[in-house]
Regions:
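Clamp-loader machinery-focused feature within the broader ASCE/P-loop NTPase space
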Residues: 2-141
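Conserved small/polar residues in nucleotide/adenosyl-binding loops
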Residues: 145-147
Length: 147
């Protein structure tokens, strides 16, 4: 995934890329809706999980890691979004065990999604590199805090 559609994100992408060797435990990427924050986060996750980055450090788009990211199936990346966004963006979504198929798609990130991350975060990376968890939009997590 290239950020060529979002030239205004080049500076933010460069700052993220400069941190890739000494990453903190979490990075909060924020911006107005529609400016490409999700795309920037996906690009950076792909950059971290790329097995053959280009000379400029950008993801190659061709290695197994990049292909798995494009197919939304990289074993070392989890994308946590609402059921509504998962449907709109064609992302994987696992409904809670008590879910009924006739209900309206949830626009909130649900607690069962974070509980499902426990096993993922305690295991070693499958491909030997890093693991990434993208939570989008992060402000949807606040509704969990008030439960």
């Amino acid at each position: 995934m290239a950020l060529t559609q979002y030239p205004w994100l080049e500076e933010a992408a460069a700052r993220l890329d400069a941190m890739r060797e000494r990453l903190p435990n979490a990075i909060l990427i924020h911006g107005m809706p529609g400016v490409g924050t999700f795309e920037l986060a996906r690009w950076f996750a792909e950059r971290l999980l790329c097995e053959s980055p280009k000379a400029d450090g950008s993801p190659c788009g061709k290695c197994p890691g990049c292909r798995m990211m494009h197919a939304n199936g990289h074993p070392d990346c989890r994308i946590v979004v609402s059921e509504f966004l998962a449907n709109a963006l064609d992302l994987p979504y696992t409904p809670p065990e008590t879910s009924s198929s006739s209900k309206k798609l949830s626009r909130e990130i649900r607690i069962h999604q974070f509980r499902a991350l426990t096993d993922f975060l305690t295991m070693a990376p499958s491909r030997g590199g890093r693991r990434c968890v993208l939570v989008y939009p992060a402000d949807m997590v606040l509704s969990l805090i008030h439960i």
